[in-house]
């Protein structure tokens, strides 16, 4: 079952990206290194509710 998730920057807290994930394959929260516009650099983004 695919669900929509939001990815938030760990440094500034901005919610920059919306993605989808398969809950059956990825039960835990996703962490990806993505570009943050506010910080103007690549930072770690975590899945939020």
UniProtKB/Swiss-Prot annotation:
The keyword Ribonucleoprotein applies. Coiled coil: none annotated. Keywords: Ribonucleoprotein, Ribosomal protein. Transmembrane segments: none annotated. One of its GO terms (biological process) is translation. Pfam families: Ribosomal_L33. GO terms for cellular component: cytoplasm; ribonucleoprotein complex; ribosome. The keyword Ribonucleoprotein applies. SUPFAM superfamilies: Zn-binding ribosomal proteins (SSF57829). It comes from the Bacteria. GO terms for molecular function: structural constituent of ribosome. Gene3D superfamilies: Ribosomal protein L33. HAMAP family: Ribosomal_bL33. Belongs to the bacterial ribosomal protein bL33 family. This is Large ribosomal subunit protein bL33A. It comes from Bacillus cereus (strain ATCC 14579 / DSM 31 / CCUG 7414 / JCM 2152 / NBRC 15305 / NCIMB 9373 / NCTC 2599 / NRRL B-3711).
């Amino acid at each position: 079952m695919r669900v929509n998730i939001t990815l938030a920057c760990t440094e500034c807290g901005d919610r920059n990206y919306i993605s989808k994930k398969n809950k059956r394959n990825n039960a835990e929260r996703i962490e990806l290194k993505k570009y943050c516009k506010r910080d103007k650099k690549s930072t770690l983004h975590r899945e939020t509710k």
